[in-house]
Amino acid sequence: MERKSAKQRIISDIKSGDVRIQVTGYIKQIKTKDYLLLDDESGPQIKVDIKNVDVPFKEKHLINVIGDLHLTMEGEKEIEADIIQDMENLNFEYYKKIYKIKKTL
């Protein structure tokens, strides 16, 4: 079975109808071995379920998360991570500017 491609989003642009997304941001907090909080500086943070992936990164590390979007019983958005990539060499300020430009096209 083929997976859908992940839509590139910033946290504040995530829609409830999104199925598979990718979000780049900083690890704000690693709560347990089960999840972390991701912050892309767009406002809100998002909970990332990391039960199915290895996370060799620490807090404040820049990562890209690819996974399925879920809504919790409380109505919060959560990403079930399939892939986590190291993005430390990315110029995050330029990335955010390019994202805004692509959004207007």
Describe the residue ranges of each PLM region:
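OB-fold and OB-like single-stranded nucleic-acid-recognition modules
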Residues: 1-105
